[in-house]
């Protein structure tokens, strides 16, 4: 909410800490402020965005999200001195300030995407698609976290497959089953990503939730595509007791969820 943004900014500034925001979903968050906060129902998304960023000292932006491009991003600053310090690293590692390692085509697409991303008809379409998929998945028996968000539907893989313990990654197992059932690709946000050893006891600690994320590509799917995802999910749930857990056979020391290899538990 705008109130949370404002209060968080005040706390940071009270202690002399610059308040930077992760801006990758700025437009979708502005849309939710508009449709959920009565004070902003008659305020345009663009004006809501301006107010959101008025509380910040800067931002980081993965433009692959709400700028609707396939590559790129930026960092923005209010403090010109801080900008200069960061700019030196940019020149050394990425490219000059005017392009930052991106092609002209990608810069042009990013500029257009920032405008398109705050179009209210687009945001309404985007949010309604996500909401629709959430309802489709609920109807076939998947435990969906409600209300759904702007870019994805989250399913509780642990509840969907209660016979699979956390040590065998139930959300990954459900994601694999969906891919085999219908070519539906999802992402685990659970213990494959977050499991770690307690620094004091050495005990393995699992993630609080075993989530499976259904992130929806933008401006690509029709509702028939979402119905197809539901059909694949329904097939999985009919045979849920046959889905087996998984074990890691190889993993790098860091970021294992990107590169790990797993196989079914016998």
In which residue ranges do the predicted regions lie?
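Conserved PLP-enzyme active-site core in the AAT-like
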Residues: 1-144, 165-166
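Short acidic (Asp/Glu) and glycine-rich catalytic loops that position anionic groups and cofactors
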Residues: 87-90, 107-116, 151-160, 207-213, ...
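Short, conserved charged micro-motifs
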Residues: 83-84, 162-170, 219-228
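Short, glycine-/Ser/Thr-/acidic-enriched flexible segments
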Residues: 65-67, 79-82, 115-117, 150-151, ...
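Conserved glycine-rich beta-strand-loop-beta hairpin in the small C-terminal domain of fold type I
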Residues: 130-131, 145-157
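Feature representing long, continuous alpha-helical segments
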Residues: 131, 135, 172, 176-180, ...
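Active-site loop ensemble at the mouth of alpha/beta enzyme cores that anchors a bound cofactor
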Residues: 158-185, 199-207
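PLP-dependent enzyme catalytic core of the Aspartate aminotransferase-like
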Residues: 117, 181, 193-266
């Amino acid at each position: 909410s705008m109130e949370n943004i404002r209060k968080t900014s005040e706390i940071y500034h009270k202690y002399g800490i610059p308040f930077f925001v992760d801006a990758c979903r700025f437009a979708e968050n502005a849309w939710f402020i508009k449709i959920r906060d009565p004070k902003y129902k008659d305020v345009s998304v663009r004006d809501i965005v301006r107010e959101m960023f008025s509380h910040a000292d800067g931002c980081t932006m993965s433009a692959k999200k709400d700028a609707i491009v396939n590559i790129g991003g930026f960092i923005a600053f209010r403090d010109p001195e801080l900008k200069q310090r960061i700019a030196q690293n940019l020149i050394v590692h990425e490219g000059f300030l005017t392009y930052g390692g991106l092609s002209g085509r990608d810069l042009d697409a990013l500029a257009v995407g920032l405008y398109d991303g705050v179009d209210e008809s687009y945001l309404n379409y985007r949010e309604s698609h996500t909401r629709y998929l959430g309802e489709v998945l609920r109807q076939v028996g998947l435990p969906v976290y409600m209300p759904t968000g702007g870019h994805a539907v989250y399913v509780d893989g642990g509840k969907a497959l209660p016979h699979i313990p956390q040590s065998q990654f139930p959300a990954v197992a459900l994601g694999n089953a969906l891919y085999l059932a219908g070519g539906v690709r999802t992402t685990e946000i659970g213990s494959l990503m977050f499991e770690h050893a307690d620094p004091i006891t050495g005990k393995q600690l699992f993630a609080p939730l075993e989530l499976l994320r259904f992130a929806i590509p933008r401006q690509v799917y029709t509702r028939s595509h979402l119905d197809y995802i539901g059909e694949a999910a329904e097939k999985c749930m009919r045979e849920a007791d046959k889905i087996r857990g998984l074990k890691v056979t190889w993993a790098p020391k860091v970021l294992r969820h990107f590169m790990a290899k797993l196989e079914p538990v016998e």
